[in-house]
Amino acid sequence: MDERIKKFIHSQKLLNLSMLDEDGGVYCASCYYAFDDKNLALIFASEEHTKHIQLAYKSPKVAVNIALDTDVINLIKGVQIKALFQKATKEQERIYYKKFPFAKLAQACIFALNIQWAKYTDNKILLSKK
């Protein structure tokens, strides 16, 4: 993965996770995440009973969007990702709790989204070429 993409993913903390719903539609959830750059995985916490986790178990191929929140057009950055949902490894749990130590107080499970494909957009790069 390009280092610019890794740097951007590390700089953010909130992702939007999308998966197929029971009726063939799309369901979305926002999650705080940590990045396992060695294994190219996004790590997040949630509870087993939540709708997005139940849907991801049924259809583990998911989509992710991470975007910089800005109104300045040349500062727009983001990454679109196709990922595979699974339970996090013990090492990934450590990565997550290092970034969000307060999450240890919750009784949530830790999950990983293994990145299969990523597309990065950075308007600063795009607009500088015009």
Q: In which residue ranges do the predicted regions lie?
A:
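Charged, amphipathic alpha-helical segments
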Residues: 1-3, 49-52, 94-96
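Short, basic/aromatic recognition patches
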Residues: 1-14
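A generic structural signal for nonpolar/aromatic side chains embedded in well-ordered alpha-helices
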Residues: 9, 55-56, 96
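Short beta-strand segments
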Residues: 12-48, 64-66
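Structural motif
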Residues: 39-41, 61, 117-119
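Active-site-adjacent structural patch at catalytic or cofactor/ligand-binding sites
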Residues: 46-48, 58-68, 77-83
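Short, surface-exposed beta-strand-loop junctions and turns on beta-sheet-rich folds
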Residues: 48-52, 70-71, 127-128
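Charged, gly/pro-rich active-site loop segments
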Residues: 73-130
